[in-house]
Design a protein with these regions (language model features):
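Short amphipathic alpha-helices and their capping/turn segments at secondary-structure boundaries
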Residues: 14-22, 43-58, 87-98, 157-166, ...
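Glycine-rich, proline-tolerant flexible connector loops at the mouths of alpha/beta enzymes
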Residues: 31-55, 108-113
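C-terminal helical cap(s) of enzyme catalytic domains, especially alpha/beta-barrels
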Residues: 271-306
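Active-site beta-loop-alpha junctions enriched in small/polar residues
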Residues: 6-10, 32-34, 66-69, 108-110, ...
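Acidic/histidine-rich catalytic cores of soluble enzymes
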Residues: 120, 130-238, 242, 304-305
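Conserved, mostly hydrophobic/aromatic
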Residues: 21, 29, 54, 95, ...
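Active-site acidic/histidine proton-transfer and metal-coordination neighborhood
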Residues: 11-19, 55-56, 73-175, 281-286, ...
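Hydrophobic faces of well-ordered beta-strands that scaffold small-molecule active sites
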Residues: 1-7, 29-31, 61-66, 103-105, ...
């Protein structure tokens, strides 16, 4: 087992992301944004500079976590699908150069003006995800699906249906402990309750190959819409983080665990002031504190953290 992190929540530039990673004694970054650019959108010169910086620092990319079929992509819009496909085709050769074998992908947004799981719409979603996964499979890349604000994130049932429909060894699950804290369990009739992280995790455990650590609290809204989360340190919200970490240990989990705090900056919030020195300093310090608190939580859950590099084993 190893630790990683979305270090762009600490620093926008790669040098800063490498710095906080090494300060923690870790060796991996889950790459998302570098100075506002993605692996699939930076030019060749920018990528070569990134590759050199990582090599010199001895830091690796365990997963590319960006915009493929995410919550901004409509399943009915072919231009959204083509954008995801283009990003994937651009990113894969660069992932291969970096030795990165996992992509964090999703399963398109849930439309507000129609049922998100009608048989007709499911057919569209399954076909498009299948095509993206096939590209990954043909290139030795694993498509790790995250339970976010997407079709698969509607409930554990939808995620399991997606697994059955895609039916590929290159399609596995990235389980995010915090996303069920504010996503609705869209099964049965409205009003839908908020999901249980523990239920989602337990139902999908056999397919989970990577874990994102996030935690939050949220109260149901009177109108039945998705509630607004307040992000917390891991273990302080309703994400069942401790129970999940104990179960991962007891079930012999040996994959990666990536920090995605959101307590210093909400990645989806484009209006936040991210440029002030005070904001930059806060994001860096809160990211480091989050990661250190989580490693302590891991020890409390029976994990033994082995030396440098962010590796762990069960006690």
């Amino acid at each position: 087992m190893f630790f990683s992190g979305f270090a762009d929540e600490a620093c926008a530039d790669l040098a800063g992301q490498i710095e906080v990673t090494k300060e923690l004694g870790w060796r991996y970054i889950e790459l998302r944004n570098v100075d506002g650019k993605m692996l699939g959108t930076m030019d060749d010169r920018e990528f070569e500079a990134l590759e050199q910086q990582l090599s010199e620092a001895g830091v690796s990319i365990n997963c590319y976590g960006r915009a493929v079929a995410n919550w901004a992509c409509h399943p009915r819009k072919d231009e959204d699908f083509e954008k995801s496909r283009k990003e994937l085709l651009t990113a894969i050769p660069r992932m291969q150069k970096l030795g990165c074998k996992m992509l964090r992908g999703m399963s398109f947004l849930v439309p507000e003006d129609e049922p998100g799981d009608s048989p007709e719409l499911e057919g569209i979603i399954f076909a498009k995800v299948r095509e993206l996964v096939k590209i990954c499979e043909d290139n030795g890349i694993v498509y790790g699906h995250e339970n976010c604000m997407n079709y698969g994130g509607m409930s554990y049932v939808h995620t399991l249906k997606l697994i059955d429909a895609v039916d590929s060894p290159a399609f596995t699950l990235i389980f995010d402990t915090g996303n069920p804290c504010f996503n609705l369990r869209q099964l049965g009739s409205k009003p839908y309750p908020i999901q249980s992280s523990w239920e989602f995790y337990r139902r999908c455990r056999p397919f989970i190959t990577h874990v994102h650590i996030k935690d939050a609290v949220a109260l149901p809204k009177a109108d039945g819409s998705r509630p607004d989360p307040r992000y917390t340190f891991a273990g302080d919200g309703t994400g069942d983080v401790r129970a999940i970490m104990i179960d991962l240990r007891e079930s012999g989990y040996d994959g990666g665990i990536t920090m995605e705090p959101h307590v210093g900056t909400v990645f989806h919030d484009q209006n936040a002031d991210k440029d002030s020195e005070e904001a930059k300093s806060f994001r860096r310090s809160i990211y480091l504190e989050y990661c250190r608190r989580f490693t302590q939580l891991m020890k409390e859950c029976g994990w033994f953290l082995e030396g440098p590099g962010g590796h762990a084993a069960k006690i």
